[in-house]
Amino acid sequence: MTAQIIDGKAIATTITERVAKGVKLRIANGLRAPGLAVILVGGDPASQIYVGSKRRTCEAVGIHSKAFDLPETTTQDELLALIDKLNDDPDIDGILVQFPLPDGFDQTSVIERIKPDKDVDGFHPYNVGRLAQRIPLLRSCTPRGIISMLEYIGTEFHGKHAVVVGASNIVGRPMTLELLLAGCTTTTCHRFTTDLAHYVKQADILVVARGKANFIPGEWIKKGATVLDVGINRLEDGSLAGDVDFAGAKERAAWISPVPGGVGPMTVATLIENTLFACNEFHSQ
């Protein structure tokens, strides 16, 4: 068996095209384009690349992107004051703060300062809580993007055992909630999990967000499983690798997402989808 590839780039394109149509429809009806504020503190090269990708995607679909590139010397109070200002700006539907922030910032306070109806990253405790209560509004971008990928390939969720490796607030925890909402039986593995292989080998749907290249050996993959690899790791030769041994896993899985070109594009596509949703649902004018 050789796995079919889940083409995140192609699926993301269908989402961005749908968002672009939604933006055009708003404008045709005499409404303003959605607005997204993107805040970057400091000059971390990886963060600059991610922010650039988000801004370009916004422009491509007609969303008004407002950039705030702040120096590394910015204080927590200054950042919170900017968020307060954007919370009150009627032309801004979403506020995105690029993480990680430089040392000295309290990330939780920053997340909680963003109004829940402008939290297009889906990180605010209010939005995560709504997902846990099965009444989601703005949903965390990477987990929601993965659900979109699974839906696109026709995944049957009910009765399936979904295993999530990683328990971060950004991916692992909301991913478990999304899969639970979809009807899966879920297991979340983390650094205190003993006998990780035991759980991975049971997974009909496996989502790995560990941040370590080739962390999951191919021989652990259940035959016929669907594998979503969130990791993106740069190897010594400069190439990129996921958290799953792709070469080994694709010989056992039915479906697998590649790195790059898998989950990554879906995160950005879901961000702009959230921005249009916030505009239409909460701030439409």
Swiss-Prot record:
SUPFAM superfamilies: Aminoacid dehydrogenase-like, N-terminal domain, NAD(P)-binding Rossmann-fold domains. Pathway: One-carbon metabolism; tetrahydrofolate interconversion. Its EC number is 1.5.1.5, 3.5.4.9. One of its GO terms (biological process) is purine nucleotide biosynthetic process. PROSITE patterns: THF_DHG_CYH_2. The keyword Translocase does not apply. Keywords: Amino-acid biosynthesis, Histidine biosynthesis, Hydrolase, Methionine biosynthesis, Multifunctional enzyme, NADP, One-carbon metabolism, Oxidoreductase, Purine biosynthesis. It catalyses: (6R)-5,10-methylene-5,6,7,8-tetrahydrofolate + NADP(+) = (6R)-5,10-methenyltetrahydrofolate + NADPH; (6R)-5,10-methenyltetrahydrofolate + H2O = (6R)-10-formyltetrahydrofolate + H(+). NADP(+) binds at G166, A167, S168, I232. It comes from the Bacteria. One of its GO terms (molecular function) is methylenetetrahydrofolate dehydrogenase (NADP+) activity. Transmembrane segments: none annotated. One of its GO terms (cellular component) is cytosol. NCBIfam families: PRK10792.1. Catalyzes the oxidation of 5,10-methylenetetrahydrofolate to 5,10-methenyltetrahydrofolate and then the hydrolysis of 5,10-methenyltetrahydrofolate to 10-formyltetrahydrofolate. Belongs to the tetrahydrofolate dehydrogenase/cyclohydrolase family. Homodimer. This is Bifunctional protein FolD.
